[in-house]
């Protein structure tokens, strides 16, 4: 199997990704039998709920030290000590110390909303013609709202993929007035690159939530959280119709991998050059929450 690589933004070096449960992932997404099992798991909500319930049991705490060591997770960033976590899910949804994720300054700067691997498409209209295994990405299916499709069809889109080892709380990328969240029911297919290489429209089929953010510098911004295999719960901690500063927490994903998608209207943001360069090469850029994503083009 071809190794997954990304650019580490902190070093600008190409890195081979450590795949959690690699043998299991290879079985699920590279074999005929495994793909059948994966589809069954993704289309059976009870199994995801059962998995989530298990990860909330106190005895799952014993997995935490080994997981931290294998994935080289920095424990100094944790708000809690390891001994304070009540379950593996409690660890998975951990909070960090505020100083662990400094927020890029400037009211014209949009920041990365999560820790994760980023791909940027500055022109959705061009991306709409992108074909993966003969399957077109559909903005209409993703949003399920004709007015929103028309509004963002010529804008930009950012995909941020969270791995199992990532910090799984998501944050506001800009100063905004946050609207209500709309839930779109769907399946729970994996968003791992092994799955996406066969069908990018997984994002349009999975359970997801959608929130529109009103901003002064970036117009209206559309923010989506996409569930994935074993992630049935997308938890919102913000209050609708309230103003938030960039970097404020919006919510968190419970156990599993997941993705955040952010859409901008046309002509409002100039993305950082390194992110654009890597995306053009088809390489994700691994970023931390709060780093610069781009600058407003509005006066």
From Swiss-Prot:
Pathway: Phospholipid metabolism; phosphatidylethanolamine biosynthesis; phosphatidylethanolamine from CDP-diacylglycerol: step 2/2
Cofactor: record remark: Binds 1 pyruvoyl group covalently per subunit.
Enzyme class: lyase
Top-level taxon of the source organism: Bacteria
Active-site residues per Swiss-Prot or TrEMBL entry: 115 (charge relay system), 171 (charge relay system), 258 (charge relay system), 258 (schiff-base intermediate with substrate)
Post-translational modification: Is synthesized initially as an inactive proenzyme. Formation of the active enzyme involves a self-maturation process in which the active site pyruvoyl group is generated from an internal serine residue via an autocatalytic post-translational modification. Two non-identical subunits are generated from the proenzyme in this reaction, and the pyruvate is formed at the N-terminus of the alpha chain, which is derived from the carboxyl end of the proenzyme.
Main location: membrane
Cross-referenced InterPro entries: PS_Dcarbxylase, PSD-B, PSD_type2_pro
Annotated Gene Ontology cellular component terms: plasma membrane
Keywords associated with the record: Cell membrane, Decarboxylase, Lipid biosynthesis, Lipid metabolism, Lyase, Membrane, Phospholipid biosynthesis, Phospholipid metabolism, Pyruvate, Zymogen
Gene symbol of the encoding locus: psd
NCBIfam families found in the cross-reference section: PRK00723.1 (NF001941), PS_decarb (TIGR00163)
Annotated localization: Cell membrane
Protein name: Phosphatidylserine decarboxylase proenzyme
